[in-house]
Design a protein with these regions (language model features):
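Juxta-kinase regulatory segment immediately upstream of eukaryotic protein kinase catalytic domains
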Residues: 2-54
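Conserved ATP-binding subdomain of kinase catalytic cores across diverse folds
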Residues: 7, 39-146, 163-174
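AlphaC helix of the protein kinase catalytic domain
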Residues: 145-154
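Short alpha-helical scaffold element within the canonical Hanks-type protein kinase domain
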Residues: 157-161
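Catalytic-loop of the protein kinase fold
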Residues: 176-183
């Protein structure tokens, strides 16, 4: 095999420097739960997959999409890009919402609160400003949202509501306040 020569050779010799500079200007943080190593390539290209694939299940301030990878159903939440002050804070001082969602899911599972298993998170930015972020988890087995309880009657509804109350009590016993019983959750 012949080595590259000519103009392409000179461009290749700069690629390491270019990539280093690009990572400084456009940082990204990707974390994959070790239990889901096989999803690393999906996580590496998450913004592209999110833009072009998946089934949208909710679109508002944030967007949720359903993906199937490796026989697993995944939920990917894309968070709205924050306003300027928070873009600076998330880039420099505070963990992104995606990273906090991952951490909170791990904490809840440790205290025995059922929550979908977290797969990972992905965050991007540009130099001093935070950009977009994504949180990935397995799909929840629970088919209901709080809105469903307000608008419909279900079989075993009282049992489900009591389970929600027990979960809330468990959270309080561990010093955790839920703070978001909004209808879409």
């Amino acid at each position: 095999v012949r080595e590259l020569g000519g103009p392409l050779h000179y461009q290749r010799s700069w690629s390491r420097l270019f990539n280093t500079f690009s990572r400084i200007i456009h940082p990204r943080r990707i974390f994959v739960n070790p239990a889901f190593k096989e999803l690393s390539s999906f996580m590496q290209a998450l913004p592209v997959f999110f833009k072009n694939e998946g089934t949208t299940i909710y679109k508002g301030r944030n967007e949720l999409k359903l993906f199937e990878r490796g026989g697993r159903e995944l939920i990917v939440k894309s968070y709205q890009v924050p306003h300027l002050i928070n873009r600076i804070a998330y880039n420099s001082f505070r963990a992104s919402k995606a990273r906090r969602s991952y951490r909170y899911a791990e904490m809840l599972r440790q205290i025995g609160v059922g929550t979908p298993k977290p797969v990972g998170f992905y965050s991007t930015g540009t130099w001093l400003l935070f950009g977009s972020s994504y949180f990935v988890s397995l799909k929840s087995e629970c088919p209901y949202t709080y809105r469903d309880f307000a608008t419909h009657t279900f079989e075993h509804q009282e049992e489900i509501l009591r389970a929600i109350a027990r979960t809330t009590a468990t959270l309080h016993e561990h010093g955790i306040l839920h703070k978001d019983y909004s209808a879409g959750n």
